[in-house]
Amino acid sequence: MAIIGIGTDIVEIERIREQRDRLGDKLAKRVLTLDELAIYAAVNMPERYLAKRFAAKEAAAKALGTGIGRGVSFQHIHISNDDNGAPLVNFTDGAALRLAQLGGCKGHISIADEKHYAIATVILES
């Protein structure tokens, strides 16, 4: 195993809350997959959930070396949780293609949040 990419992102939760208040669910629909949107609609603090997913997907895109754009969209990166609640990152479409181009086989993710911020780090391995 070798590390082939690493990315980190931090998001101010209040900024997400303000966008949600101003634009409704427009950002959520752009960032979240259908499965993630279903969870977002059911959680108690949707702006916190969205901030964590936004940070996670930005971190994953940075680890891929592209950022969002250049063939990788938010919809190509899916964040879920295993049976113990640990986060998982999965790649499809353009993100999966980029991972393969890098010789990657797996992504590891850590997500954390506090009162004001959400942060995520993604490590890609070959």
Swiss-Prot record:
GO function term, MF aspect, one: magnesium ion binding
Substrates-to-products reaction catalysed: apo-[ACP] + CoA = holo-[ACP] + adenosine 3',5'-bisphosphate + H(+)
Location of this chain's protein in the cell: Cytoplasm
Positions contributing to Mg(2+) binding: D9, E58
Gene3D superfamilies linked to this entry: 4'-phosphopantetheinyl transferase domain
Protein origin, superkingdom: Bacteria
Keywords: Cytoplasm, Fatty acid biosynthesis, Fatty acid metabolism, Lipid biosynthesis, Lipid metabolism, Magnesium, Metal-binding, Transferase
Cellular compartments per GO CC: cytoplasm
NCBIfam families: acpS, pantethn_trn
Descriptive protein name: Holo-[acyl-carrier-protein] synthase
The organism of origin for this protein: Shewanella denitrificans (strain OS217 / ATCC BAA-1090 / DSM 15013)
Lineage: Bacteria, Pseudomonadati, Pseudomonadota, Gammaproteobacteria, Alteromonadales
Encoding gene, per UniProt annotation: acpS
